[in-house]
Regions:
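The beta1-alpha1 cofactor-binding region of Rossmann-like NAD(H)/NADP(H)-dependent oxidoreductases
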Residues: 51-61, 93
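Residue(s) in the substrate-gating loop at a strand-loop-helix junction
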Residues: 131
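Substrate-binding pocket helix/loop in short-chain dehydrogenase/reductase
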Residues: 87-88, 92-97
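N-terminal Rossmann NAD(P)H-binding glycine-rich loop of SDR-like oxidoreductase domains
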Residues: 15, 23
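Conserved glycine-rich Rossmann-like NAD(P)H-binding loop of the short-chain dehydrogenase/reductase
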Residues: 29-44
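Conserved small/polar residues in nucleotide/adenosyl-binding loops
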Residues: 138-145
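A short, exposed helix-loop element centered on a Lys and neighboring polar residues
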Residues: 111-112
Length: 146
């Protein structure tokens, strides 16, 4: 069993991209790292949990399990997300809703699950990672009307 002295980090979307790099960096820095993703792509030295961030009950259950095992979560890094390319008029509404569910409401679900324990322990950090496409004024999604 790992020492309770080591701090605990939780990373969403940790199976690829920035999330996977974040998982590796936190693990290297000495954190006990838990990783949420829908894909079953375990990373060595990391506790992978197959969790869909859009499923509030699943998120609550998984965070509860981490808190039972570790007692606290000091760092939450929300990296889960995906992008849709192309002009908005060609984007299916179902795709846009799925993107909001993961990118926004997924972040809300996990943050809401972790925040009460951070408040009780009077410490903790939440980092939300987003794509530059969210603020890029040249995005086709913003200038697609004629």
């Amino acid at each position: 069993m790992e020492s309770k002295q080591k701090r605990t980090a939780l990373v969403t979307g940790g199976s690829s991209g920035i999330g996977r790099c974040t998982v590796a960096a936190l693990s290297k820095a000495g954190y006990i790292v838990y990783e949420f993703s829908r894909r079953d792509v375990p990373v060595e030295g990391v506790k992978h949990m197959c969790v869909d961030v859009t499923d509030e009950a699943s998120v609550q259950e998984a965070v509860g399990q981490i808190l039972l095992e570790r007692g606290s979560i000091e760092i939450l890094v929300n990296c889960a997300g995906f992008g849709i390319s192309g002009a908005v008029e060609f984007t299916e509404l179902k795709q846009a809703k799925a993107q909001f569910d993961v990118n926004f409401f997924g972040t809300v679900n996990v943050s809401r699950a972790v925040l009460p324990s951070m408040r009780r322990q009077h410490r903790g950090h939440i980092v939300n990672i987003s794509s530059v496409a969210a603020v890029d004024r040249k995005s086709t999604r913003l200038n697609s009307s004629h």
